[in-house]
Amino acid sequence: MENGNGATTNGHVNGNGMDFCMKTEDPLYWGIAAEAMTGSHLDEVKKMVAEYRKPVVKLGGETLTISQVAAISARDGSGVTVELSEAARAGVKASSDWVMDSMNKGTDSYGVTTGFGATSHRRTKQGGALQKELIRFLNAGIFGNGSDNTLPHSATRAAMLVRINTLLQGYSGIRFEILEAITKFLNQNITPCLPLRGTITASGDLVPLSYIAGLLTGRPNSKAVGPTGVILSPEEAFKLAGVEGGFFELQPKEGLALVNGTAVGSGMASMVLFEANILAVLAEVMSAIFAEVMQGKPEFTDHLTHKLKHHPGQIEAAAIMEHILDGSAYVKAAQKLHEMDPLQKPKQDRYALRTSPQWLGPQIEVIRSSTKMIEREINSVNDNPLIDVSRNKAIHGGNFQGTPIGVSMDNTRLAIAAIGKLMFAQFSELVNDFYNNGLPSNLSGGRNPSLDYGFKGAEIAMASYCSELQFLANPVTNHVQSAEQHNQDVNSLGLISSRKTSEAVEILKLMSTTFLVGLCQAIDLRHLEENLKSTVKNTVSSVAKRVLTMGVNGELHPSRFCEKDLLRVVDREYIFAYIDDPCSATYPLMQKLRQTLVEHALKNGDNERNLSTSIFQKIATFEDELKALLPKEVESARAALESGNPAIPNRIEECRSYPLYKFVRKELGTEYLTGEKVTSPGEEFEKVFIAMSKGEIIDPLLECLESWNGAPLPIC
């Protein structure tokens, strides 16, 4: 019998269309695994997003993707439908018929005529009653009075989809009608209530999956949640889903087929990895934006550096950052600054900027590898025993051992923690005026820094997020306890690790949100900085021309040569070091301007003895006029920017990173934060976090990279 991919099911060919009895070129599947890793990570993410948005998920047993699982889990049945491959029906029926035939012939099979686990020495001929008892004793979970101990409905939907996919392959001995019933529950958005805890994911996710079986068999303690959030009894759930014929009386092996699988752990892992892949790309793009607003040197993305390191994740991360920075208006402006007094500045940027490709690259490789591992798992047959109709036998093994889930989730969580650590280091530099190349302390955007502490609370929150994230990076899989009378003496803890990784993803989203809003604040501050610097230069130039050019009798004055050096002072001084009180004698602007005039006076020689040619005599007049004019001009420039009419437009509009800024500022309507407003940072973070959780950030993120050709810039 052929499945939806044209491959014959159950014992005749494997999932890649190869005869099990035939010698193949890739018998160990290493080639298939390697082939799955070809192409760029970004292209893979784009493909995931496209699959996620398709309205139909067609199940045939062997082609399910993590993005399809994420779509079913997240969209609650609205806009996406599950369809079963009719071609799989015959294979499923064949294995179900084989179980009944073998039972009638007196064949001794685990879980069909025997007890379970460490008590498999017991025997019975009451196959149906045995399955009923299996579901009863596995209903050992605790829900309590609220939802704290209930598996999230999204994860339950993911588990239902994955379990259907596994059972469709026809090695499990279950009726097709049961799979159709679960599909109806999914399509009608009716979700069984599963306990959050209680599984060690070997022998499969027995306890939580038994509650799906409990709903199918009408157990009185089973419950479901309907489309509107109303709690449903089994009778109500069946009626609402349109499942006819009443509750199922499980035949031999069917209960075991339902519960003895890794679907809960791998389903949640699929959800986690869909988000983790997107967050990894976001971290790459935000690292590039960080370089822009920090006036970083783009040399750190040079392809030769990364080519010589050989790691593909690093090479791609650097190429993505290089693409964002190539032609960036910020990079062009920063280059001019770096050329000014180069020997007095650090030769290279700090590690959080300069080594971000080297840091992120391995994390992307880990996340990508984990994605492929989980994708193999959700397309695997993972129960026991396996029914091989072609050889007329039940094979007793251990595919229920969810080690790929536990290991991949531990690794993913460590990668997520590393991404968060980099993000925290970058954010810490961004808000610190000792490191951020002229941005104000705490990214304070108001006029009075004594009454505006900007992102100080956000930095404290980021430290909290990062600390918890680093704690979560600790592995789960080394905490295995021997279970079930020492029969399950090693077990994967797959769902526990998936749950912890889900928590880690949520924290990374909190950090990504905070950092992204901080970057947008920095972009706006650079815009303000540019407008204010232009205003200060124009004002200093105007006053210099008026005061320093001519003498009292209209003759040219020696001080006319000071203007160029005065403007150089403005160029060299950080605007936010003095702009709250630009004419203060304790701030660097007035001090350096006076110092410049004094130096010119000292070089003026004998002219200083003459009042009409003395530069020193001009200093007080210059300062007085500047004090009278500059504060007004600065306030006027601020007001113009706040009203949307700045003299100089925002550089971000000329950059490839603009779509993310536009999304945060214009589409979500977040504000430039200052102590002069009532709006708190958390209110703005909330807008971005909710949008990020809904996946709304995906399109602007990918728009930043839509013109990237998938390769580094050529080395010429």
Curated annotation (Swiss-Prot):
InterPro entries: Aromatic_Lyase (IPR001106), Fumarase/histidase_N (IPR024083), L-Aspartase-like (IPR008948), Phe/His_NH3-lyase_AS (IPR022313), Phe_NH3-lyase (IPR005922), Phe_NH3-lyase_shielding_dom_sf (IPR023144). Its main location: cytoplasm. It catalyses: L-phenylalanine = (E)-cinnamate + NH4(+). (E)-cinnamate binds at N260, Q348, R354, N384, K456, E484, N487. GO terms for molecular function: amino acid binding; phenylalanine ammonia-lyase activity. One of its GO terms (cellular component) is cytoplasm. SUPFAM superfamilies: L-aspartase-like (SSF48557). GO terms for biological process: cinnamic acid biosynthetic process; L-phenylalanine catabolic process. Pathway: Phenylpropanoid metabolism; trans-cinnamate biosynthesis; trans-cinnamate from L-phenylalanine: step 1/1. It is found in: Cytoplasm. There is a cross-link at A202-G204 (5-imidazolinone (Ala-Gly)). The modification 2,3-didehydroalanine (Ser) is found at S203. The active site is at Y110. Its EC number is 4.3.1.24. Keywords: Cytoplasm, Lyase, Phenylalanine catabolism, Phenylpropanoid metabolism. Contains an active site 4-methylidene-imidazol-5-one (MIO), which is formed autocatalytically by cyclization and dehydration of residues Ala-Ser-Gly. This is a key enzyme of plant metabolism catalyzing the first reaction in the biosynthesis from L-phenylalanine of a wide variety of natural products based on the phenylpropane skeleton. Homotetramer. Belongs to the PAL/histidase family. NCBIfam families: phe_am_lyase. This is Phenylalanine ammonia-lyase 1. It comes from Petroselinum crispum (Parsley). The gene is PAL1.
